[in-house]
Curated annotation (Swiss-Prot):
BP terms from Gene Ontology: division septum assembly; FtsZ-dependent cytokinesis
Species of the source: Aliivibrio salmonicida (strain LFI1238)
Protein's name in the database: Cell division protein ZapB
Domain of life: Bacteria
UniProt keyword Oxidoreductase, yes or no: no
Length: 80
C-alpha cells in the first residue's frame, strides 16, 4: 500500500514540477512581449513628440504669415 501511495505522490510531484516549468517559460515569454511593447510605446511616444513639435512649428509659421498678411492688408487700406 505504501508503495502505491509513494508512486501517486511521485506522479503528483512530477506534475507540479512540469507545471512550474511551463509557467516559468510562459513568464519568460510574457517578459519578452512586455519588453517589446515597452519599446514600441517609447518609439510611438517619440514619434508623437516629433509630430507635436512639427505641428507647433506649422502653427507658428501660420501665425507669422497671418501677421504679415494683416500688415500688407493694412498698407493696402492706407493706399486706398
Amino acid at each position: 500500500m505504501s508503495l502505491e501511495i509513494l508512486e501517486q505522490l511521485e506522479a503528483k510531484v512530477q506534475m507540479a514540477v512540469d507545471t512550474i516549468a511551463l509557467l516559468q517559460m510562459e513568464v519568460e515569454e510574457l517578459k519578452e512581449t512586455n519588453a517589446e511593447l515597452t519599446q514600441n510605446l517609447e518609439q510611438a511616444n517619440n514619434g508623437r513628440s516629433e509630430v507635436e513639435q512639427e505641428a507647433q512649428k506649422a502653427r507658428d509659421e501660420q501665425a507669422s504669415f497671418e501677421a504679415r498678411i494683416r500688415g500688407l492688408l493694412g498698407k493696402m487700406e492706407e493706399v486706398e
